[in-house]
Amino acid sequence: GTLFNDINIQRRNSAGVITEQIKVPIEYSAKDKMLLHIRRMSTTDASVQTTLPRMGFVLNGITYDGTRKLNTLGQVYAANTAASSSTLLKQYNPVPYNFDFELTAAVDNAEDGAQIFEQIVPFFTPEFTVSVNLVPSMNVKPDISIILNSTTTEDSYEGDFTTRREIIWTFGFQLKGYIYPDVKSGSVTKSV
């Protein structure tokens, strides 16, 4: 979700002057629950409605990725900076997993949806790579690839004039990550 914290919408008047700038809120929420909340708030009381645009994301699945597997018994070592210099930290190799995420953006007009689309898609060609400090004690900072697999849009343009229009953009992502085992502490062998 942090990757999409800075999505903003600009509304302009007929002269092209920016009249409003909206930071699009994001929450951890499945698409169905987010839509149910929007619809419920739209029908129960006209004076209290959910503000659009808004975004939600959810983890859809985790699968093992054998194509990136490392030697199971391989270990990484690092000096223990939190203790005396005679200790060593060790950790077995991580296990590769793919994490499938879905990002949903709900808007009430096509222009807002297009602006969100334009702030996300250009960074994924089709993948975006970030360096993450996953295990600070071991100084493990791998490059993590996030792949944009799909983009779809739904428009509920049918209905009477009292029905709120919903345009839903759905982005499917796959994060190529790792699960790391525990870090163990041991002593340094000074002579054999």
Predicted regions and their residues:
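Acidic-leaning, charged glycine-interspersed low-complexity segments
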Residues: 82, 93-96, 115, 125-190
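Short N-terminal helix-initiation segments at or just after the protein's N-terminus
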Residues: 35-51, 111-119, 176-191
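Homeobox/homeodomain signature
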Residues: 45-47, 89, 163
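Oligomerization/assembly interface segments of phage tail-like spikes and tubes
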Residues: 53-61, 93-109, 118-120, 165-178
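Small/polar-rich, solvent-exposed N-terminal microdomains that initiate assembly or binding
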Residues: 1-75
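Extracellular/virion structural assembly segments
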Residues: 6, 62-63, 79-98, 107-129, ...
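Membrane-lipid interaction segments
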Residues: 28-37, 41, 71, 76-93, ...
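"Short basic amphipathic alpha-helical interaction patches in structured regions
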Residues: 69-77, 116-123, 135, 188
